[in-house]
């Protein structure tokens, strides 16, 4: 199983090198870096669905990335440009969707789909494929993280009293 979808320009090969990459949802940047030469520049954005599930969108093989961890990104905002993952591949965008709250890069091919999602088949991500489902505020992701930490602190304090 390929863990994502690869998007190429109309002309193929490197015709899309440097083309803009836009965020597909309102999101929070949770990772920016180069996990390995094969991935190249990578961004991971977290988004809370209308049903409350956190999904991650991984944009890889970028030539440039313009978003920093902790930054709030709006749908349609330019976050990078299409690249070649350090000349390892012809230029293209590798886009992965994950049903996960932890930042894990992993491999580009796996034996089971696991937490990787197919947006065309998974209505949990885009109910009825409505564009409105892409708009919940990314701040809800950080709010959930803060609430979880607060609950953990309360539990720790209650267990030691």
What are these regions (language model features)?
Residues 1-5, 37:
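Serine endopeptidase catalytic core focused on the charge-relay Asp
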Residues 16-18, 22-66, 91-96:
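Zn2+-dependent peptidoglycan hydrolase active-site motif and core
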Residues 82-102:
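Active-site/pore-lining binding-face segments in mid-to-C-terminal subdomains
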Residues 42-45, 74-88:
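Short hydrophobic beta/alpha edge segments that flank linear recognition/processing sites
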Residues 6-7, 136:
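Bulky hydrophobic/aromatic "packing anchor" residues in well-ordered structure
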Residues 65-77, 96-161:
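Acidic, glycine-rich catalytic/binding loops that coordinate metals and/or anionic ligands
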């Amino acid at each position: 199983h390929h863990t994502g979808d690869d998007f190429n320009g109309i002309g193929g090969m490197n015709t899309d090198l440097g083309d803009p990459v836009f965020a597909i949802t309102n999101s929070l940047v949770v990772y920016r870096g180069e996990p390995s030469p094969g991935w190249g520049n990578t961004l991971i954005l977290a988004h809370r669905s209308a049903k409350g599930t956190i999904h991650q969108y991984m944009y890889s093989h970028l030539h440039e990335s313009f978003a920093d961890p902790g930054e709030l990104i709006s749908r349609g905002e330019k976050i990078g440009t299409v690249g070649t993952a350090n000349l390892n591949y012809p230029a293209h965008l590798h886009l992965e969707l994950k049903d996960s709250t932890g930042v894990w890069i992993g491999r580009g091919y796996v034996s089971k789909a696991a937490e990787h999602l197919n947006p065309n088949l998974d209505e949990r991500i885009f109910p009825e494929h409505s564009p409105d489902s892409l708009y919940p505020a990314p701040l809800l992701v950080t709010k959930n993280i803060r609430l979880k930490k607060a609950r953990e602190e309360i539990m720790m304090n209650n267990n030691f009293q």
